[in-house]
Each structure stands twice: as structure tokens, then as C-alpha cells.
């Protein structure tokens, strides 16, 4: 399973949204994610991948694709920093 698919599954589970509704070009509002759902998703991502996602980062996400790109970037940054400190 790709990282994008893992994240879509996680969003679906945490926000109780049908996977079929989760298109990367859909806005978070169109998907039906409210602030509580977003916090649940962020906590789940932080727990699963060991990354930190700040409020300022989230303010820049308008679509599911934006959110997935942000999470992927955070995961990649964490992996690079761990590799650099090894």
C-alpha cells in the first residue's frame, strides 16, 4: 500500500468519511472534515509516523491533496534527519 493510500485510509477511519469521497482535489470542507476531525487525523498521523504537524502548517492546507503533501513532507523530513544523525 502506498503512503498516500495509507493516509487516505487513516483520514477515512479518523474522520468517519467514506474512502470513495476522499479525492485529492476535494477541499477539506467538501469532504466534510471539521476542526475536530482534523485534530483527530493530525493526532493519528503524529502517533503513527512520529512527526509533528503544527497549526501554521495546517492553515496552508485547502485540499486533501495539500494535507497529504504536508504529511508526506513531514515524514520525509523526519526520515532525512534520522538518516543524517545516524
Each model region followed by its residue ranges:
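Two-component histidine kinase catalytic core, primarily the HATPase_c
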Residues: 37
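Conserved ATP-binding motifs of the histidine kinase catalytic
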Residues: 34
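Phosphopantetheine-dependent thiolation modules in NRPS/PKS and related acyl-activating systems
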Residues: 2-31, 41-42, 48-86
Amino acid at each position: 500500500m502506498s503512503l498516500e493510500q495509507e493516509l487516505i485510509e487513516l483520514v477515512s477511519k479518523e474522520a468517519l468519511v467514506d474512502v470513495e469521497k476522499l479525492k485529492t482535489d476535494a477541499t477539506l470542507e467538501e469532504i466534510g472534515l471539521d476542526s475536530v476531525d482534523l485534530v483527530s487525523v493530525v493526532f493519528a498521523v503524529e502517533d503513527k509516523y512520529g512527526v509533528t504537524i503544527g497549526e501554521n502548517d495546517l492553515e496552508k492546507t485547502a485540499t486533501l491533496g495539500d494535507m497529504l503533501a504536508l504529511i508526506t513532507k513531514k515524514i520525509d523530513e523526519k526520515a532525512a534527519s534520522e538518516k543524517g544523525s545516524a
